[in-house]
Amino acid sequence: MTNLRKTHPLMKIVNSSFIDLPAPSNISSWWNFGSLLGVCLIIQILTGLFLAMHYTSDTMTAFSSVTHICRDVNYGWLIRYLHANGASMFFICLFLHVGRGLYYGSYMYLETWNIGVLLLFAVMATAFMGYVLPWGQMSFWGATVITNLLSAIPYIGSDLVEWIWGGFSVDKATLTRFFAFHFILPFIIAALAGVHLLFLHETGSNNPSGLCSDADKIPFHPYYTIKDILGVLLLILALTSLVLFSPDLLGDPDNYTPANPLNTPPHIKPEWYFLFAYAILWSIPNKLGGVLALVLSILILAVVPFLHTSKQRSMMFRPFSQCLFWILVADLLTLTWIGGQPVEHPFIIIGQLASILYFLLILVIMPITSVFENNLLKW
């Protein structure tokens, strides 16, 4: 008799995705981040659900409802900080996952990659709206500044901003709709992640060498289930350490002050995971140009597969491309640092140079270097 897991309509889907899935025998720990992102999403949905039970999306009570969660609800402080720092862990895993894809040429699976880019946008939108909900100073002013960027769109800009606000400024209507969207988007993200996996399993996983691994496959379970569990344990260790020892390390002190439309904070800045894009935004003096650069800094990922000029898929055997990849990583870290600094000399010029280097590396330098490497190998 055939095993039930191979015949049952529901179990055979799970079986073909997580148990009997043929996987390359040489995938490294860099391939763990997909499962870690799944775990992060589950943590965020569960903690978010419990927070939503006690939160009120009204400008008069939002801030005090968050205070109430931390002070009066059983383990409310733990749920709140798991949710806030869980977002940081989510983005760390996301950036490492995307970095892995760029390094090993995983972007050659076009459908999987493009759904991944869509997922990145969805997660960023969700995180932005979630940051507005506690209704602290940085929540309010962050929402005001970022939504105001849409006014740079010619002709329809100002109408669009008022439509998103639900009035003439960020107010009760804005907070209520942001809460509604923040609640629904994670479920859309989960559905998109399912499609992401569906397309990945159509082609099979890439591997560090970038070569076809059909001749050497191993079952996903037990090899990679055990490997993923180790990754999950390390993730939970990092998250709980952060939550229990320094929960406010990655937050902004200004968000412990209730939102006040009459008092602007000295430095308006988003959470750390948006700082690189924020630095690119204010590196361009023109408003519309800045908004375009901000969107393109993420959207450029969708163009990467078409800029692949190398005869090899992975960077594993391409030392020049490897150097450029790590320069790109250093550049993004520089942009993240600049994004958190005040908008003044010398930070403006450093940000402008780092922004130019970011786009140049991806669009020009890396494709040309790949051609050069092909010629070196007489390909």
Curated annotation (Swiss-Prot):
Belongs to the cytochrome b family. The gene is MT-CYB. Heme 1 (or BL or b562) is low-potential and absorbs at about 562 nm, and heme 2 (or BH or b566) is high-potential and absorbs at about 566 nm. The cytochrome bc1 complex contains 11 subunits: 3 respiratory subunits (MT-CYB, CYC1 and UQCRFS1), 2 core proteins (UQCRC1 and UQCRC2) and 6 low-molecular weight proteins (UQCRH/QCR6, UQCRB/QCR7, UQCRQ/QCR8, UQCR10/QCR9, UQCR11/QCR10 and a cleavage product of UQCRFS1). This cytochrome bc1 complex then forms a dimer. Gene3D superfamilies: Cytochrome Bc1 Complex, Chain C. This is Cytochrome b. A ubiquinone binds at residue 201. InterPro entries: Cyt_b/b6_C, Cyt_b/b6_C_sf, Cyt_b/b6_N, Cytb/b6-like_sf, Cytochrome_b, Cytochrome_b_C_euk/bac, Cytochrome_b_N_euk/bac, Di-haem_cyt_TM. It comes from Sorex coronatus (Crowned shrew). Its main location: mitochondrion. Heme b b562 binds at residues 83, 182. Component of the ubiquinol-cytochrome c reductase complex (complex III or cytochrome b-c1 complex) that is part of the mitochondrial respiratory chain. The b-c1 complex mediates electron transfer from ubiquinol to cytochrome c. Contributes to the generation of a proton gradient across the mitochondrial membrane that is then used for ATP synthesis. GO terms for biological process: mitochondrial electron transport, ubiquinol to cytochrome c. It is found in: Mitochondrion inner membrane. Its cofactor is heme b.
